[in-house]
Regions:
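Transmembrane beta-strands of outer-membrane beta-barrel pores
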Residues: 57-63, 83-85, 92-96, 122, ...
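Repeated loop/turn-to-beta-strand initiation elements of outer-membrane beta-barrel proteins
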Residues: 85-90, 125-131, 169-176, 204-212, ...
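Residues that define the transmembrane beta-barrel architecture of outer-membrane proteins
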Residues: 49, 71-75, 110-114, 127, ...
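Outer-membrane beta-barrel "beta-signal"
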Residues: 246-250, 273-287
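Detector for outer-membrane/organellar transmembrane beta-barrel domains
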Residues: 155-232, 258-259, 285-286
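Short glycine/proline- and aromatic-enriched beta-strand/turn motifs that initiate or cap beta-hairpins
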Residues: 29-98, 219, 278, 284
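Cleavable N-terminal export/targeting peptides
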Residues: 1-50
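Surface-exposed loop and membrane-interface regions of Gram-negative outer-membrane beta-barrel proteins
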Residues: 33-36, 86-155, 271
Length: 287
């Protein structure tokens, strides 16, 4: 496939990434202003720290358009800590990447994804910014037939991200996030990902708090391995989703979502990593 706007989007993504990294902290709420700090203040005001946890059950785990559970269900959960503008967390999900034979015994290629992330976020007026780093790990997926580490099976990778979001009208939020990995999954070289999302909160009815949301993502890679393993022979692909999240009983939510990609249906078919259209339901509890 050929994307005529790929180059302009990539340049825009680079500009947004640099602006968020270099200019983000200067936009933060609460930054000292000239003459605003009283001379009698000798210590900064303590920043509140919070800790939360979540657990979810999904009919399928989709990541950037690809099924991570071979069209099967997933159990997921994580912990998040926030202290001032700094945040950090860990999140995990069950996986089903298929079965391979190791030393004559069937073994699951990868049974779990474990993400560790941290960053800084703030707000200036109606615009929020977020810069961070994410480490994606897949325990057990880097073994060869002898059970030892093998570079050919390397799947873990690191991404840095920068995002901006803001309210465009009452309860309607538009956000743009850029991700970059210097060595993406499956040893596929440097990869850029641009996501644009929108969410609209609706009035509460019958004890339900609905939010409509949609997201479009575009990913680019410049390595032959990326084209062969991720983008169906091309140097980029597009993915999108749209759905509704229903909050209830304060800490519970149900998300109903439609996913699809621009990838060829022949490339998307198979026993694992399906990337055609599908519907996903997720029940989540946060505390």
């Amino acid at each position: 496939m050929t994307w005529t706007i790929a180059k302009s989007l990539r340049l825009g993504a680079l500009g947004l990434f640099a602006a968020a990294l270099l200019g983000g902290p200067a936009l933060a709420d609460g930054m000292p202003k000239r003459g605003a700090v009283k001379k009698t203040e000798t210590t900064p005001e303590p920043r509140a720290c919070t800790l939360s946890a979540n657990v979810a059950l999904a009919t399928e785990y989709i990541f950037r358009g690809f099924s991570q559970t071979a069209e099967g269900p997933a159990i997921q959960g994580g912990f998040d800590a926030t202290c001032g503008r700094f945040y950090a967390g860990v999140w995990a999900s069950s996986l089903d990447w298929g079965v391979v034979e190791r030393r004559g015994v069937d073994d699951t290629w990868a049974y779990m994804e474990l993400d560790v992330y941290a960053g800084f976020k703030g707000k200036h007026g109606h615009v929020a910014w977020d810069v961070g780093v994410i480490y994606y790990a897949y325990p057990n997926s880097t073994r060869n037939d002898f059970g030892t580490f093998d570079e050919r099976f390397r799947n873990e990778y690191v991404e840095v991200k920068a995002g901006l979001s803001g309210e465009v009208w009452k309860d309607g939020t538009l956000g743009v996030t850029v991700f970059f990995s210097p060595d993406y999954q499956y040893e596929t070289g440097d990869v850029w990902t641009l996501e644009v999302g929108f969410a609209q909160a609706l009035p509460k009815h019958w004890g339900l708090t609905p939010t409509l949301s949609a997201l479009v993502g575009q990913q680019w890679g410049n390595d032959g391995a990326y084209a062969a393993r991720v983008a169906g022979g091309e140097d980029s692909y597009t993915y999108w989703n749209a759905g509704v999240t229903l909050g209830f009983l304060e800490k519970w939510s149900i998300d109903l979502r439609y996913w699809d990609t621009s990838l060829d249906r022949d490339f998307c078919s198979g026993p694992t990593f399906q990337c055609d259209e599908r519907f996903v339901a997720t029940l989540k509890f946060t505390y």
